[in-house]
Amino acid sequence: MKIDSNGIVNPHSITNEIPSYDEKQAVDLNGNAFAPNGTFQKKDLISHKNDFERTMRHDVLHTNPKIEVRSETHIYEPNDSLFKENQDFPSNPTAHSPSSSSNDSVITATGVPDGILRDSPIVSALEPPSSNSSSSPQLQNLKHQLSSPQPSRAPIDRSSSNPVTSSQQPPNDRSTLSSSQKAKRPLKRSYSEKNSSNAEPSGSRSGDRGTNVSTSGSLLDGIPPDIGSASWAEAVKQKRVNMRRRREELDDECVLVGTRVSEGHENYVTAYNMLTGIRVGVSRCQAKMDRELTPADFTARHKFTFDITGNELTPSAKYDFKFKDYAPWVFRHLRQLFHLDAADYLVSLTSKYILSELDSPGKSGSFFYFSRDYRFIIKTIHHSEHKFLREILYDYYEHVKNNPNTLISQFYGLHRVKLPFGRKIHFVVMNNLFPPHRDIHQTFDLKGSTLGRELDENQPCQSPMCTMKDTNWIRRNMHLQFGPLKRQIFLTQVKADIDMLSSLGIMDYSLLVGIHDLSRGNRDKIRNSILSVYDPNVSQHRVPSINGNESHSNVHVIRQVVNSTGPVSLDQSCNLLPTDQFVERRNFMFYSDDGGFQATDENNEPGNFIFYIGIIDLLTKYSYVKRVEHLWKGINHSDSVISAVPPAEYASRFYKFVESSIKPTLLVLKPFPLKPQDGQRVNKQQSVNAGNVRTNNKHGSLNNNTAPSSRNAKSTSAHKSPKTEHRFPFPCRNVTTNTSSS
């Protein structure tokens, strides 16, 4: 057995014949001579063979780092996946099989020992000669690789049973190879080429696992493919996590209605000061132990001064301003009566410092800001309305305490903010009557009077969100579809509420009615599908708060419910209603049916509509101005048709109008013409009265830049409830609002 110039010995050449060596080669790996005459003795053959295997194993481990060594048999075996992806040798039908008595090396069908990589330089010495070896391109490539200078060998550590320690193994990174080494490495074949070759099948050996390795060199998610497989997978995973986090942050900054008020908006400073004052004022009050209210609490005023430096009483702020919190203890108890958790309240308003604003103020000059989750409204009010609310605060608190199912607006806070060299801005925080997860297909604002209480139907509406009034209600033969049981409950509560308002000298309030058609659900996509919405079934996401009340699910909104509600039959519609509502809604009778009050027939069976009802505009006193208006309009018109009448007369007329509007018969919705936008033609069958409340001239306006869609009324009738006739679709997308009192 002779050793060639490269120091490689073919184990198949070892036979019983003892080959001769010169004196320089007649030494073992430790430098000891095998025989004085330079020849091997037969008794030394086995030990020399073991030394050769260790040497060859060391070569392979340094040349191909991805090799596993099994200590049980002391035979190195390559990683399965790497072994398969480096099958660059064609099958050799003339390969010689090893002797059955040899247990140290196993020869595969290609003639290469099982433990050696196919692209290793040692393969050339172990591969038996074949007739077509000179013409094989793989062998030519291998010869070129063998002719290149090989890296120097590291000394073998014989003290350890493991031939190569982990510290001696080069790093498993393709990027550490030099450019010349990369160029000299044989190219890997594609998966199809491997399967088409006559190489050993991947499943022929026990324990093999197929691994698909991309060799195209293209970037995946911006990550280079020439890094380790584990690092590459981890980098891809981290990049996708970052992308998902960025999408969630963008979704959190979305608003459901109006224009987003953020940095750069002309009213951002005002909105920032409002939210900062609310956060500090409510947090200070909630941090104290609860106690009973005293008469002084109804007139209390807490002042805060904010600047960029801050002090021991107030934190630093981005702007200098003054903030005043009115009756904080009273509104704390009111929030508890409305089942609103303080932490949930603050998170909804101030977690992202994002509000949405109506595009233009109402006739009264008030501005409306909505929390980003559409649950709360911040409304600026006149100084006279601010004073009047403080005057009636005690009566309002007692009424809410004694009538937990009241229909009047829910006030959560009364505040004032003053900018340097600016005017004082009074504002109130209250509830939004309409839920964010339901489309409101038609909206009405009812007062019981008819003079000037009409939205002209002969002229198309500028926006698809139009709030109609009393005359439109009467002309369309609209009514509240309540059976005998719900009729009695509803009228009893309306009577109690208007009696309280009349006793306080309040008039000019109105009944806000939003109608949701269950047969249509949210299929019209009135809201933009990219905006966040609530999932009414939030019980599994809710966590208890410190004071024992259940808190809403992080105030984060879920989008899966908006488009999930499709047309269903009348007997199935009631079964699809979520059993759980918002914490502050589910405890009230008139908000118990998916945030509203579901229609019923004469047998008190559930109907096909949900009514969202509330009494708004509570801060209009029968003042001197209203008396003059009553005298002026009373010259040419009867008191029964004008709005400015004394509170007692107004309450009586209002109750009679509501009472006459309740019927158990089926309700039929009619369309309203829409003004064409952007050159689009709108036919008479298009619907415009869809979506949430479109604020009228009393409550402000909203103009979202979304074009309405149209659909044939005939296609809509195919999806209608079997007991309800729908004559038109509701394709509008803009969102409108409920602007409750003041």
Swiss-Prot record:
Its main location: membrane. CDD domains: PIPKc_PIP5K_yeast_like (cd17303). It is found in: Cell membrane. Residues 264-662 form the PIPK domain. Keywords: ATP-binding, Cell cycle, Cell division, Cell membrane, Kinase, Membrane, Nucleotide-binding, Phosphoprotein, Transferase. The keyword Transferase applies. Residues 1-21, 82-228, 677-742 are annotated as: Disordered. Its EC number is 2.7.1.68. Residues 90-105, 129-142 have a biased composition (Low complexity). GO terms for biological process: 1-phosphatidyl-1D-myo-inositol 4,5-bisphosphate biosynthetic process; cell division; dynein-driven meiotic oscillatory nuclear movement; phosphatidylinositol phosphate biosynthetic process; regulation of mitotic cytokinesis. It is an enzyme of class 2 (transferase). PANTHER family: PHOSPHATIDYLINOSITOL 5-PHOSPHATE 4-KINASE, ISOFORM A (PTHR23086:SF8), PHOSPHATIDYLINOSITOL-4-PHOSPHATE 5-KINASE (PTHR23086). Catalyzes the phosphorylation of phosphatidylinositol 4-phosphate on the fifth hydroxyl of the myo-inositol ring, to form phosphatidylinositol 4,5-bisphosphate. Involved, together with the calcineurin ppb1, in cytokinesis. Interacts with opy1 (via domain PH 1); the interaction is direct but opy1 does not appear to regulate its3 localization or function. This is Phosphatidylinositol 4-phosphate 5-kinase its3. It comes from Schizosaccharomyces pombe (strain 972 / ATCC 24843) (Fission yeast).
